[in-house]
């Protein structure tokens, strides 16, 4: 398959404690997850023989923030200049590291003709309630140094009830700082138990996360109608656990470990089928599960059916994130 988008979780570590983050949830429950960073040498090994000239790299992830990874700058250089990727989009809360680090990234962005750019996850103009443990003052110091060095920036603003009235102010601030502005509505924030509420999430689907999750787990639907990013957009996800998944959602399903669905998959087709320590990216993508079984398993009667596919991407993708870049 053509790999158009690769999302890479460079770290499972983070300075923040966002209430909706899987890492925060696992920490609060005292549950295990791998606390680690991907190494530059691993990135080189995995991608050495793959043509990435038409590929977008997304540095984001489920658990951590890429700026925690000590090899980050080397990895960015590798993708930009050795692999000559189309572009690199890095998402960060921006609340840590020294100013020299951010100046360096700004120069990297400028000198790459802005093929490297940053999505700053800042959810408010004067307050940043969702990003717990993150100093907004420190964030703006880092943003300003990066921008002044010539870095390309997008301010990504998740709409919550507490910050909805500040959207116009944030838009104006972004303009003054030379940043693009993007609002983001995420249906997962329509949870009965969400600490930070979002009316905007209900515009995506009025049903709560728990209601749809219950229907998915009970297989209470006739046709899944999966809008799969892997199949439609040619997207793959690599987690810090060195597993290659079609998307971040199935990786999240694995680390959350709420059900036996992923363990059932491993039991039936082998625990190492998507393990990058055992197989190359090409070998994994040519496996029977990726080529045929994944799509077949969207049928809720299939023995390897994973309800998470319906929960996040079913009903023709109606619960997908809505992102509007201005």
PLM regions: where:
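A C-terminal junction/extension of Radical SAM enzymes
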Residues: 1, 151-154, 162-255, 301-318, ...
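Canonical Radical SAM [4Fe-4S] cluster-binding loop centered on the CxxxCxxC motif
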Residues: 1-40, 247-249
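Flexible mid-to-C-terminal extensions adjoining Fe-S/redox cofactors in radical SAM and related proteins
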Residues: 1-4, 24, 28, 243-244, ...
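Exposed loop/turn and edge beta-strand positions of beta-sandwich/beta-sheet ligand-binding modules
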Residues: 4, 53, 232
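Generic structural signal for small/hydrophobic residues in well-ordered secondary structure
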Residues: 6, 10, 14-15, 65, ...
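A short, conserved beta-strand element in the Rossmann-like catalytic core
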Residues: 19, 66-67
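A short acidic, helix-capping loop that chelates divalent metal ions and anchors anionic groups
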Residues: 27-31, 126-131, 193-194
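Radical SAM/AdoMet-radical enzyme domain recognition
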Residues: 37-60, 69-186
């Amino acid at each position: 398959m053509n790999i158009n988008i690769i999302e890479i979780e460079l770290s499972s570590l983070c300075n923040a404690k966002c209430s909706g983050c899987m890492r925060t949830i696992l920490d609060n429950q005292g549950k295990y997850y791998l606390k680690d960073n991907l190494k530059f040498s691993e990135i080189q090994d995995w991608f050495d023989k793959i043509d990435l000239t038409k590929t977008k790299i997304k540095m984001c992830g489920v658990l951590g923030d890429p700026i925690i990874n000590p090899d980050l700058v080397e990895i960015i250089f590798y993708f930009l200049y050795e692999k000559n990727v189309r572009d690199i989009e890095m998402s960060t809360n921006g609340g840590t590291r020294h100013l020299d680090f951010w100046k360096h990234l700004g120069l990297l962005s400028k000198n790459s003709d802005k093929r490297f750019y940053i999505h700053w996850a800042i959810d408010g103009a004067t307050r940043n309630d969702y990003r717990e443990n993150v100093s907004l003052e420190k964030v703006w110091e880092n943003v300003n140094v990066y921008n002044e060095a010539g870095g390309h920036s997008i301010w990504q603003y998740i709409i919550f009830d507490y910050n909805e009235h500040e959207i116009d102010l944030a838009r104006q601030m972004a303009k003054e700082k030379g940043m693009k502005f993007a609002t983001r509505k995420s249906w997962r924030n329509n949870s009965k138990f969400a600490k930070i509420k979002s009316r905007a999430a209900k515009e995506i689907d009025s049903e709560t996360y728990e209601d749809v999750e219950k229907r998915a787990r009970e297989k209470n639907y006739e046709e899944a109608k999966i809008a799969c990013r892997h199949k439609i957009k040619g997207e793959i996800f690599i987690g810090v656990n060195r597993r290659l998944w079609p998307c971040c959602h199935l990786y999240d399903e694995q680390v959350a470990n709420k059900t036996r669905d992923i363990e059932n998959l491993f039991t039936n087709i082998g625990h190492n089928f998507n393990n990058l320590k055992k197989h190359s990216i090409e070998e994994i993508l040519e496996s029977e599960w990726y080529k045929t079984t994944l799509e077949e398993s969207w049928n809720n009667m299939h023995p390897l059916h994973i309800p998470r596919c319906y929960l996040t991407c079913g009903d023709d993708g109606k619960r997908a994130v809505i992102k509007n870049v201005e």
